[in-house]
Every structure is written in structure tokens, then in C-alpha cells.
């Protein structure tokens, strides 16, 4: 990829779950050349980690072409999973070191595929600490969780 001509996009994501498991939602803020767009979705029965992951999947999927992305999440699970743990999981056929199946493998596979289309710098920000875009995402995710409209078909519960 020729990074000099790729669009540079900032993405902020958050997930929320009322009960964990329970109704959940994700929130996304995307910024390109100073213009912001927001996305959210609510699910009837899911987990917080699934919503954190789905936020990143949906955000990257919404980019119509390969981009340079700075993706900021308050989820260490997402950031560490996609930057560190996933390499071993893939080598072991989506099994953890203890030979047990990777939890949320369906979403890890989707996130991996979406991330491969882009050049992504995965960043972490402390949640509920006054970070403007993270607070926006949190509000979007919570509102979506309070008004679920979809089923999380990958959630086994």
C-alpha cells in the first residue's frame, strides 16, 4: 500500500452491556478531515467484550477503501487481543495456549480480516476519564444497549 495517498482516519470505539451478559450496544465516532460521523447498534443478549470488538469491526468495515487508521478504544481486551494474542491463536488454529477454544473467535476473525485491509495504530484510553470521544462512544453504546434491535447471532447464550 502506498501510505502517502491513503486517507487518514481517526476512530474511537466503545461497547456497553447492561448485565454482562445482557442487552448490549456499541458506539463509534469516526473523524476524517475534521468531519465526525457516529454509528451505534444495540443487541438483545450479548457481552461487553463482544460489543467492544463489534464496535471496532463495524468501524473498520465502514471504511470504503484502505486507510491509515488511529483506532482508540478503552478496551485492553481488544487492543491486546488484536496486537498480541491473535498471532498465537491463529498458529494454534484458534485455540488458546491451554488448548481451549478462543472466546469470541467469530469476532476475532472478523476483526483480523477488517484490520488487514488498513494500516491500524491501536491505541488505548482510560474509560470514564473525561476523554471527549470516548465519552461520546460510551453514550452511544449505552443508549443502543437500552434500545436493542438486533440479535447477536454469535453469542452462544
Curated annotation (Swiss-Prot):
Gene Ontology cellular-component annotations: cytoplasm
Function: Endonuclease that specifically degrades the RNA of RNA-DNA hybrids.
Main location class: cytoplasm
Subunit structure: Monomer.
Every RNase H type-1 domain range: 5-146
Biological processes annotated in GO: DNA replication, removal of RNA primer
Name of this protein: Ribonuclease H
Family: Belongs to the RNase H family.
A Pfam family this chain is assigned to: RNase_H
Keyword Magnesium annotated: yes
